[in-house]
Swiss-Prot record:
Gene3D superfamilies in the cross-refs: 3.30.70.260
Homology family: Belongs to the UPF0250 family.
Species, as recorded: Neisseria gonorrhoeae (strain ATCC 700825 / FA 1090)
InterPro entries recorded: UPF0250_YbeD-like (IPR007454), YbeD-like_sf (IPR027471)
Name assigned to this protein: UPF0250 protein NGO_0791
HAMAP family (UniProt xref): UPF0250
SUPFAM superfamilies recorded: YbeD/HP0495-like
Tree of life domain: Bacteria
């Protein structure tokens, strides 16, 4: 890790990062999230994602455990997920 990366990131890379994704109640939500993450982290498998409905059932929440190598990769995953039509929020 370069000195510049140390100054701009509190995350130590490489690491397994838990992405929290909220989105539409849709039968393809889980698969869409997984496929989007795999564009930037191809080693992500189906067992790395868990989903659950929101308390009122209006949304679906997903947590994806993603192995990321650097901040750029993580940023690319965030951008890809937030631009997906089924995704509302990514944390």
């Amino acid at each position: 890790m370069t000195e510049q990366e140390n100054k701009t990131s509190l995350i130590e890379f490489p690491c397994t990062f838990p992405l929290k994704v909220m989105g539409a109640v849709h039968p393809e939500f889980e698969q869409a999230v997984l496929e989007t993450v795999r564009l930037h982290a191809p080693d992500t498998q189906a067992h790395h994602i868990t989903t659950r409905p929101s308390s009122k059932g209006n949304y679906t929440g997903a947590t994806v455990q993603v192995k990321v190598e650097n901040q750029e990769q993580l940023d690319n995953i965030y951008r890809a997920l937030t631009s997906h039509e089924l995704v509302k929020v990514v944390l």
